Structures are given as structure tokens and as C-alpha cells.
């Protein structure tokens, strides 16, 4: 599906373990950083934005078509790097542009000026006249239109969340789900744990805090003092941990019915959801065995 927003420029996983012995590596309860390593699978579902705008000067009559793809789940820093490379600018230019007051990005007040979560995943046109400010502004404007749709606003309210909280939850679902089919189940786990006052304990939030992407989380990682450590802090993290797409957002406002509190991807394509902690521990043991075999 290709999304073409209107433009005036357009031409004609898991629970706390207080009683368990300290393991050498923290068992993985949720899907984590594989997304950044599997971008190729994401490209097929990226939303296309085929509007030739973002210009500040006249363009040549004929110019080779170029595009910038922002895959679902990319973090802001990844988007900034891609923008700099696409426009041939020094590294850090897009980041500085995004945080400058002159950028005038249409972010919600709750974002506190942080564009994370609002750099909408899509395919954007790039020309010789494209500027980082114009490109980032178009990403944010696109996100604002998508997230501000009546069904999203109503769906967020039905789940007891603000739209910004919904984007935060969607960014977690985007990072944790092993595949799109699991997103609505992962979203249900998030909702169930929030409703019970349980810490989310999502490894994807730790990865964000530590600026990495990995499938291994140590016990020490879960003890870091950081607002994105959802092992130590209850509730949602303060901001999105990436830029979610439509499927993750839809999963949060329309989660699958279920009583699940835990999940673990024991192998690619095999994610186990359960409300029973003992059963979950069995699944975790299988995951650990598989990881051990991978390491040799």
C-alpha cells in the first residue's frame, strides 16, 4: 500500500523474578533487537510517500529519481544518519536540524521536542533541492496526520491511553514482535501487564537505553538506572523507542483477546504466549538451549 498524503507542493516480554538465583545471562522473555538486523524484511511493508516536495529552490527539468526509505522500527538516530547520507551532508546535520527551534516540527506537547516515534516510516522522494529540515518536517507531518486520524484517537481512548502513549506502546510492539502476525498478541501482553501494575520488563527498552540492538540481555543490564529500564520502572518508557508503522499502531488499539502475561520467541517464527509462569519458564529454557546451540 502506498500512502500519498495531500500536499500543497504536489504537481498534477515477561515478569520480575525476585526469588530466582542470579543467572549469568538474563533469560530472554521478549523479542529484541533483531529488527535492525532484518531491515530487508521490513522494506516490503514500508509505506510509500510519493510526493515530490521539500524544495527550497528551483530544480532541474530532469533529475534521476531518488528516494529515502525509513523502515518501520528505525530509531531517530538511524533516520538522521540516513538523511545525512542521502543528502550528502556532514554527519550530525539532520540531528542538529531536528532539535533546533527553527525546525518547527509539529510534535505533540508530550514529546518535549523529541521527534522519536514521529519520523514516520515511509519512502520519501529526494531531489537536489531537498533539505534536512524539509524532509524531517514532512516525516513528522505525515506521522501527525496518521496518528491524529479519528480511528486512532478513538482507539487510544478505548484502551485508556493518550495518542502519544499509544505511539510509545506501538514502538515497543514494533521492536518486540517476531513477525507482524504476532503484533496484536504482543500488544495484549503490554496492556495486560500495565493493567495489573506489572513492570513491562521489555528488553527492547533496555536496548534503546544502551544504544544497541541485541538478542542477549544480562542480569546487570536489567539493573541499570535509566528511565527506559522497564525492569526497574513500571509503566511505559518516557518516549517511543523507535518509529512504529501502521501495523504496530493498529495492534495497540485493537489487541488480540487473551490473558497472556509472558512471551518468548524460542526460534524464528515460533513465539510462545502464556499466562502461566511455570510454562513460560519452560519456554525460556528452550530459548536458552537454542541460543547455546547457536553459539556452539
Where are these regions (language model features)?
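Core subunits and conserved enzymes of cellular information-processing
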Residues: 2, 65, 82-85, 258, ...
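Terminal targeting segments of Actinobacterial cell-envelope proteins
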Residues: 1-33
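Bacterial extracytoplasmic/cell-wall-associated proteins, especially those involved in peptidoglycan
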Residues: 106-296
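Signal peptide-directed extracytoplasmic domains
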Residues: 32-37, 46, 52-151
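Helix-turn-helix-type domain boundary/helix-start signal
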Residues: 27-28, 68, 159
